[in-house]
Curated annotation (Swiss-Prot):
Organism, scientific name: Schizosaccharomyces pombe (strain 972 / ATCC 24843) (Fission yeast)
UniProt-listed Pfam families: Arrestin_C, Arrestin_N
Signal peptide (residue range): none
Protein's name according to its UniProt entry: Putative arrestin-related trafficking adapter SPBC839.02
Any one Gene Ontology cellular component term annotated for this protein: cytoplasm
Length: 504
């Protein structure tokens, strides 16, 4: 293939022909034989049942483990944690996220416990089906990212015999009599025992990643160990999602992608696409403007989302690059032997404009392993580029060689693809609305804007919400009082007080 010398790094001009090789297959999201189910999201894989009947109020209790003696439930203050910043400089300037919640142990009958423990762990795993060089024995590599442990109760530690170290507890009235039921360090009587936990998570930790050849995952794991030798341990696990969000102080992320170039003094083109940071499932505007300076005839306009995936292991000494994925987002073609610009808006002579909208693939495409958001983890690197392809014909062009009849201009612009949870409704401060359970938060934020609007309307309805603030008309008039003192009077009195104090 003939590639001429390029004048700049943005655009690449080369002849197009039906027999051109070296192109990756194009993924047409609208022409697939099987479409992914929009109701299936990457964040709904693990279902955790709710825990009802607990006295201690929390956002939502989720059941982790249960047996004939007790059950363990957990409530998270925030079901999703956001780590702002993408580059090292942005991460250092941001504050840490905080993982906090409550752990409840509900006892059904008197039991002796040895230890109550909660662990927060983060792990990464990359798959290598062909084997890791040089020996090719290992087919995967797993690393530990973090491991933090809270020991709420231990039989060897001295704690209160009634609460057993819990911040809140409630014993059934039948077992409240200490004369008939003497207290001991290990014995837990039927009731509820709540333990709070809190952990700051630095923004330097990687976000949660889920691909076919690698993943990064975090989870909370509980351990309730009984004192008896033959009574097993009760364990439970709940996943925690860490989402990478844009930096709050960065202005460059909201700037649009704008490319303005000229080619051979025959064509001047301007392409503007959305923003440099786009959210999965978001609809972004696209604007095209072409100025014909010579005899140029347009035939096709296409917009691609290019995804590149790299996997590393053995301290980044081994690398594997997957085939670049081309997702066709937008396409406009002209009929045979006609010009594409004939249907466009003509601003001035030989100046044409087109404005349209493009939908970015959503999280249901991510669940189908079609696309994934950008990552910052060194061992799993995923980057994206918006590629604009302009196909046209031009007479007497030096780039046309052989049987090629058309020319194509490739315009590559880097873009950062964010998770669908990074919509404005998730990253901005919440409205005054009822508490939304964690099961509803697991849905994609963009697909549930209608639900969010319903909750917002419900919050503003004073007939439904009894805690709504009163209207301005319901306030009674305040009786007249003396006006506040002047600033000079306060300053003089303060100065005289200081002088008297100095004299003393």
């Amino acid at each position: 293939m003939y590639i001429p010398n390029l004048r700049n790094y943005h655009d690449k001009v080369f002849p197009y022909g039906p027999s051109s090789n070296g192109y990756n297959p194009v993924i047409r999201l609208t022409d697939r034989t099987t479409q992914p189910d929009p109701s299936q999201h990457i964040y709904q894989e693990e279902k955790i049942s709710k825990c009802e009947g607990l006295s201690y109020r929390a956002r939502e209790w989720l059941l982790l483990s249960s047996n004939s003696n007790a059950r363990v439930a957990i409530a998270l203050a925030e079901p999703v944690l956001y780590l702002p910043g993408a580059t090292s400089s942005e991460i250092q300037s941001e504050h840490s996220a905080v993982l906090r919640g409550s752990l409840c142990i509900q006892i059904y009958k008197p039991v002796k416990l040895k230890k109550i423990q909660l662990s927060f762990k983060g792990k990464s795993r990359t798959e290598w089906p062909e084997g890791i060089p040089p020996k090719l024995f290992d087919t995967y590599e797993e690393n530990s990212i973090m491991n933090h442990c809270w020991v709420f109760f231990h039989s060897e530690q001295k704690v209160d015999e009634n609460s057993h170290g819990a911040v809140w507890y409630k014993v059934l009235p039948h077992y409240a009599d200490t004369a008939h039921y003497p207290r001991s360090m290990e014995c837990f009587y039927p009731g509820e025992y709540v333990y709070n936990f809190e952990l700051p998570i630095s923004c330097t930790y990687p976000e949660s990643i889920q691909t076919d050849m690698g993943r990064v995952y975090y989870f909370l794991e509980t351990l309730v160990d009984r004192s008896s030798t033959f009574s097993g341990k009760s364990t439970g696990r709940i996943p925690i999602e860490l989402i990478r969000s844009p930096c709050s102080t960065s202005v460059a992320t909201s700037e649009p992608i704008l490319v303005s170039k000229s080619w051979e003094d025959r064509l001047h083109y301007e392409v503007q696409v959305g923003e440099k940071c786009v959210v999965m499932g978001q609809v972004v505007p696209v604007n095209f403007k072409f100025t014909l300076l010579g005899e140029v005839k347009f035939h096709k306009l296409r917009l691609f989302l290019m995804e590149r995936r790299y996997y590393y292991c053995r301290q980044r000494s081994v690398r594997r690059k997957e085939k670049t994925r081309q997702l066709l987002l937008y396409e406009r073609s002209a009929p045979k032997n006609q010009c594409l610009l004939s249907d466009w808006k003509q601003v001035r002579p030989d100046v044409y404009e087109l404005s349209d909208q493009v939908r970015i693939p959503g999280c249901h495409d991510m669940a189908a392993n079609i696309v994934h958001f950008d990552t910052t983890y060194p061992n799993i690197k995923i980057t994206h580029t918006v590629r604009t392809v302009l196909r046209f014909s031009c007479e007497n062009s030096p780039e046309l060689m052989g049987s090629a009849k058309y020319l194509e201009i490739y315009i590559d612009s880097p873009v950062r693809l964010l998770s669908c949870r990074c919509s404005d409704g998730s990253t901005m401060l919440p409205a005054y609305c009822p508490i939304i359970p964690s099961s509803e938060v697991n849905f994609c934020s963009i697909d549930n804007r209608i639900i969010a609007g319903m909750n917002r309307d419900l919050a503003l309805d004073s007939d439904i919400i009894g805690n709504s603030p009163p209207s301005f008309d319901s306030w009674t008039a305040v009786p007249y009082q003396a006006p506040p003192p002047k600033y000079d009077d306060i300053f003089q009195s303060g100065s005289s007080h200081d002088e008297n104090h100095d004299d003393n």
